[in-house]
Amino acid sequence: MHAGGQSRRLPGYAPSGKILTPIPVFRWARGQKLGQNLLSLQVPLYEKIMERAPEKLRTLIASGDVYIRAEKPLQDIPDADVVCYGLWVDPVLATHHGVFVSDRKQPEALDFMLQKPSLQELENLSKTHLFLMDIGIWLLSDRAVELLMKRSQKDASYSDLKYYDLYSAFGLSLGNHPRIIDDELNKLSVAILPLPGGEFYNYGTSRELLSSTVTLQNKVYDQRQIMHRKVKPNPAIFVQNAEIGVTLSSNNDNLWIENSFVGASWKIGSRQIITGVPRNDWTLALPDGVCVDIVPLAEKRWVVRPYGFDDVFKGDIQDEKTLFLGMPFIGWLAKRGLTPDDVIGRKDDLAAAGICPVVEDIEERRKVLCWMTSELELAEGKKIWLNSQRLSADEISAKADLRQLYAQRESFRKGNWELLARNYEKSVFYQLDLADVAEDFHCLKIDKPDVLPSDAPQMQRIHNRMLRAEIAKLNGKDFLNDE
């Protein structure tokens, strides 16, 4: 599974990897887990595919920053060297991805593959060919894996690996009329399968984190299938593993708060992702489009990383096209009386430039964050930034204390569990995987929820008793009254 990259376009989950991004429970789903992430949602489909795959197809390659659903049963998988799954999509969407092109007379066989074709190319092909968008699920035979490894090595025997792209090099060498001539790869048999009832959700960027989650949540509008009665002020607000004291409104569009404390004295807006913020008593105003990520390091130190909602952490720091906090980075420096010489580390790539201060004191964290985002005249914030050790985005991922990050998330989740149980009428509590709920209550030492009143829906009362009994069992206590 492709994962563990730099995550330039989704900085909030770069340290742990996008594949471990926590995903909110779908409001219409049954049996999901409060602690679910992108990986746990992806794996069941891939396991089903491998169960149906012929014996010689023993390797599955998939992308780590997507969520793919199949609403219908999988078809039989042909015995080919390479089998790729695709989706029927709008041509405009296909221009941003790889595309499998098949002859209309032989739709199950790959004719050739294209990478990000133009609309004109697709229109010209549509008379004689069909096309499916590549969704990144590839099955390979041992022979195909052997050739892929061979192409990834330098010419000298037992030498180092070289850069070789699965999609733009290997993929374009496949099919009946491949775009790249390679005698060995051209001989591999290839089959293309449309994913039955397939759905594709991209989680590669900060914006897609919100847009894909909104689309998933709104897949079902039928109120009979949605157990809880909570109505959010804006459908694009997501709060999980967090404690918030602010009142959210319809103005908080595209807001994601996770593993964070947002106090009553915060002012937040729209297009914001807030991750990793420890408990605090800050007075803070975040402008629209400004995101905050606080990452724990060893020895009780924290690195402060603000960024823009659409920042990509890419490019020379002196290039006007290189953005930070939604503006040219060179302009961000100038507004604060700084020059590129004040930046630590490399200057040819923003992801490798040391711009994020490491701060121990919690109040100093607030001051430097305010100075970096909105209070340009805050002299103390500038002084802290100049005198602090500063890490690049790459260094943050390398040095993050993931144990502490996960411990903080667990602490917030414990508080969320208690709140969800108390507010069961307006929460997803009783539509979750109750065995997982019981396990979490046991591990986090949370008291079992109270017995529901007699006027609660009957199925909820049954689920309540089942859950109480299971928690008591795990705690080694009497459970017969509930069971």
What is the predicted role of each segment?
Residues 1-3, 58-65, 191-193:
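Extended hydrophobic secondary-structure segments that form protein cores and membrane-embedded regions
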Residues 1-12:
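N-terminal nucleotide-binding beta1-loop-alpha1 segment
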Residues 5-6, 66, 142, 206:
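Conformational gate/switch positions in structured elements
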Residues 8, 18, 98, 198:
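Flexible, active-site-adjacent loop/turn segments at secondary-structure boundaries
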Residues 14-17, 27-156:
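Conserved core of the sugar-phosphate nucleotidyltransferase
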Residues 82, 88-92, 135-483:
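Left-handed beta-helix
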